[in-house]
C-alpha cells in the first residue's frame, strides 16, 4: 500500500464532531454547498473512485487528508448513501438553496391572486416530492402510493391554508398578507413529512446502543425523529420567509421599484437566497443526526427486551433523517 494517508480514517462518519452544534453546522455547510451542483460527471466519478478505493484500503499516492474529505463530501452530495445510485440533480442537498430561493422568492412575490397561489404552492410541493423521493431510504423505499398520498395531501393543505389566509388578510395591512406563503409552507410540512414517513410511524425505526448494535424498531423513536425534522424544516424556511416581507414592504414604496416593478421578483429571490445560504445548514444542525432517547420512553415490549439483554443501558440512538 502506498500513499501519505493512514488507511483508518473513518470516512463513513462526518469530519467534524457531531455532538456539538458547531460541528454539525460545519458538516451541513459542506453538504449543502450549492457549488457542488456545478461539478461535472467526470469530477463526480473521480470522487467516487477515491472513496471506493480508500474503503478497500487503496490509498492513491500523494492523496492528502483534505483531498480525501473533499472527495467524500462530493461523493455524498451526489450518490445515494444506501443504493450508491447517482441522485436526481434537483433532489440533492446541494440544490436546496438555489431551488428553494427561486421557488420561495416567487411564492412571496406572486401571492395576491388565486391562480398564482395555486401554481407556486404546486411547484413547491412538487419539488418537495422530488427531494423526498431522491432521498428515500434504500432499506424501506417509498411506494408510489405513499409518495402520491403525501404529495396530494401536502399540496391540498398548502393551497387551502394559503387561500384561506389570503381571504382573511384582505382587510388587514399588506405586510400581514406577505406572511401567508410561510403559513402555507409550515402547514404543508406538518402534513407532508409525517405522511411521507407513515411506514416508520407504523412499524418503527431501528434503534441501537451507542456502539451501533441494533436493539429493535421503535415507533416512539420515529415520532421524535419526525417531530425534530418538521421543526427544523419550518425553522429553515422561517428566515427566508419572515425577513424579506419587511424589506420588500419598504423597498416597494421606494422610487426604484415603483419605476421598475418587474424587479420585485429578482430582488426578493436574492434576499431569500441570502437568508437560505445560512438558514439551511444551521437549521439542519439543530438536532444531532444520530438522535437519542431514554429507554423508559420506548414501547413497553421493547423496553423489556432491552432490559433483559442490556440491563445497564439507559439511552438508545437512531437516525432522525433530514
From Swiss-Prot:
Name of the gene this protein is made from: SFXN1
Listed name of the protein: Sideroflexin-1
Family classification: Belongs to the sideroflexin family.
Catalytic activity: L-serine(in) = L-serine(out); L-alanine(in) = L-alanine(out); L-cysteine(in) = L-cysteine(out)
Record membrane topology: Multi-pass membrane protein
Cell compartment(s), UniProt: Mitochondrion inner membrane
Function recorded in the entry: Amino acid transporter importing serine, an essential substrate of the mitochondrial branch of the one-carbon pathway, into mitochondria. Mitochondrial serine is then converted to glycine and formate, which exits to the cytosol where it is used to generate the charged folates that serve as one-carbon donors. May also transport other amino acids including alanine and cysteine.
Cellular component aspect of the GO annotation: mitochondrial inner membrane
Molecular function as annotated in GO: L-alanine transmembrane transporter activity; L-serine transmembrane transporter activity; monoatomic ion transmembrane transporter activity
Mitochondrial intermembrane side: 121-146, 196-228, 288-322
Ranges in the topological domain labelled Mitochondrial matrix: 2-102, 168-174, 250-266
Keywords associated with the record: Acetylation, Amino-acid transport, Membrane, Mitochondrion, Mitochondrion inner membrane, One-carbon metabolism, Transmembrane, Transmembrane helix, Transport
Single biological process term from Gene Ontology: one-carbon metabolic process
Cross-referenced Pfam families: SFXNs
Claim: Transcription regulation is one of the keywords in the record: no
InterPro entries in UniProt: Mtc
Modified residues (N-acetylserine): 2
Taxon lineage: Eukaryota, Metazoa, Chordata, Craniata, Vertebrata
Membrane-spanning parts: 103-120, 147-167, 175-195, 229-249, 267-287
